Regions:
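Iron-sulfur cluster-binding cysteine motifs and their immediate structural context
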Residues: 6-23, 37-54
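N-terminal Rossmann-like FAD-binding beta1-loop-alpha1 element of flavoenzymes
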Residues: 67-101
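N-terminal FAD cofactor-binding segment of flavoenzymes
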Residues: 91, 104-157
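Predominantly flavin-linked oxidoreductase catalytic cores and closely associated redox partners
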Residues: 105-107, 191-333
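Short beta-strand to alpha-helix junction loop
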Residues: 170-191, 240, 312-317
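FAD/FMN-dependent oxidoreductases across multiple families
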Residues: 205, 312-392, 396, 401, ...
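Active-site-proximal substrate-binding core of FAD-dependent oxidoreductases
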Residues: 395-444
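C-terminal auxiliary extensions adjacent to catalytic cores
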Residues: 435-492
Length: 492
């Protein structure tokens, strides 16, 4: 640490400081949301946020899981024990490959996911089948018990300014699920171990090991070198290790995003569902662009996605202050939670940082591949699609072992998972999430006036034909209004 203070400027909770002897200190550890922003921006790689810090009620969740000794060499090393990384581990291990997973978090009980626990899947990624207590992805020959699923969703919507909102009903044939993100990852970890994968928690990978241009393993934070034929980077949206492998991740950064979630215990009597809320925000500065969310699943979650053109935190108060203010004052939140919020028990504060970037299908180099959220924009792949991505990648890696060829050309078939339909849908999803950024409140109001009859669950769970027919009907009915507002028409 050289005392530059970059970490202080980026912290959305405003809990960091630099001492006179040029050392970073955490002044209020209990409020850390573990977004790892301080690590991400440190020019000297001097910051290591070892554990996800949670309120005292969940101190047991940050106990370090005991693991076996690390071997000198594996067939496959996976970095990151999220859905995509564990999908790779499951697929490789059941094919008989000696597979290790290195995860920086302390144990499998903490997922670090900030989203609302909604299960959905992009076209071409997988098909969810649930029957008799079993969760299945038939295309990927994957089954496990569905104990992580909390309930079927009863509503899913987009709330706009002025009381406008999209139709939230699940139409016939459409089913959405609310899940426990922690249980989902926990079960995947158990499944990977059942097939023979070796999981190492509280183990941080510092960089990759090279012989010439080929990746030949990893170097851990303590300097331990571990060899492998293939390294799989599944290190999430910031993709720190992917960059060190020189896998080409599009560097275009349209926006920096800070995403924080306050997670509460769920009381009885609430209906399961999720809403994004656009416009009508409490900020005095109308240039602030944010997207609050409220979700009711295994927990009650109130979140905010803050967009910025700079990597630094720009609001005048900590980000959890603004989320709590939205939770207490926004009528849209009260509509879903009633008077429960004042009595809810806070379980965790979780956060992450994203960079919006264009999709990249070039996710392989000699000896390494990237999977999961590090090749998409804004962490939009979701739990199930990420798992499917990992399962698919594992099968392709088995073929590379059969060829005994770990060159970029041999490993590049991993990118065949990314279909044209998937790319199109992800781009459309990102565009809709950027509406609060590109539209002022007046334009948003007009947008919702025109499109509030749209059925929001159809966007997630409908067929391409259902989505197209719905949108064409709405646009035909409102063609003159759209022509009168060219900004909306052009953006659509």
């Amino acid at each position: 640490c050289n005392g530059c203070g970059t970490c202080v400027k980026v912290c959305p909770q405003m809990i960091l400081a630099v001492t006179e002897d040029k050392k970073m200190v955490v002044e209020d550890p209990g409020r850390c949301m573990s977004c790892y922003g301080c690590e991400d921006v440190c020019p000297r790689d001097a910051v290591f946020n070892k554990k996800a810090l949670l309120p005292d009620t969940r101190l047991e969740d940050i106990e370090t899981e005991q693991t076996r000794p690390i071997e000198e060499e594996y067939d496959v090393i996976v970095v990151g024990a999220g859905p995509s990384g564990l999908g790779v581990a499951i697929s490789c291990a059941r094919e008989g490959l000696n597979t290790a997973v290195f995860e920086r978090l302390p144990n499998r009980r903490v997922s670090h996911h900030t989203d609302g626990g909604v299960l959905f899947v992009f076209p071409g990624a997988a098909t969810i089948k649930r029957e008799g207590g079993v969760f299945e992805l038939p295309e990927h020959n994957f089954k496990m018990t569905d104990g992580f699923i909390h309930s079927e969703m009863e509503w899913l919507t987009l709330d706009g300014p002025g009381g406008y909102r999209f139709d939230d009903r699940f139409l016939k044939g459409m089913t959405g699920y609310c899940c426990s993100k922690d249980k989902f990852v926990h079960q995947l970890a158990d499944e990977a171990e059942k097939h023979g994968a070796k999981l190492y928690y509280d183990t941080r990978v510092k960089t990759v090991k090279r012989e010439g241009e080929r990746i030949t393993g990893v170097i851990l934070l303590d300097g331990t070198e571990v060899r492998s034929n293939v390294v799989v980077t599944a290190d999430g949206v910031l993709a720190r290790l992917s960059k060190k492998t020189k896998i080409i991740l599009n560097s275009k950064s349209d926006a920096h995003v800070q995403y924080v979630t306050l997670e509460y215990k769920r009381p009885e009597g609430l209906k399961s569902g999720f809403s994004f809320m656009m416009g009508d925000l409490p900020f005095e500065d109308d240039t602030v662009k944010a997207l609050p969310c409220v979700g009711i699943g295994s927990h009650v979650e109130v979140s905010m996605i803050l967009h910025s053109k700079t990597k630094f935190y720009t609001l005048n108060k900590p980000i959890d202050y603004w989320v709590k203010k939205i939770a207490k004052t926004d009528k849209r939140v009260k509509k879903y939670l009633g008077d429960h919020l004042d009595s809810l028990e806070l379980v965790a504060v979780k956060g992450t940082r994203l960079r919006l970037r264009e999709l990249s299908r070039d996710n392989a180099v000699d000896g390494a591949v990237a999977v999961g959220d590090n090749w998409v924009a804004g962490a939009q792949l979701g739990n199930v699609s990420s798992l499917a991505n990992g399962l698919f990648a594992g099968k392709e890696l088995k073929k590379a072992f059969e060829r005994n060829d770990f060159s970029k050309g041999s490993l590049s078939s991993v990118s065949d998972f990314i279909t044209k339909d998937m790319v199109k849908t992800i781009k459309q999803t990102e565009k809709s999430m950027l509406y609060p950024v590109v539209m002022d409140n007046q334009t948003l109001l007009k947008y919702f006036e025109i499109f509030s009859s749209a059925n929001y669950p159809t966007f997630f769970y409908g067929t391409k034909m259902q989505i197209s027919m719905m949108m064409m009907g709405i646009m035909a009915k409102n063609i003159f209004k759209l022509l009168a507002y060219p900004k909306i028409f052009k953006y659509l």
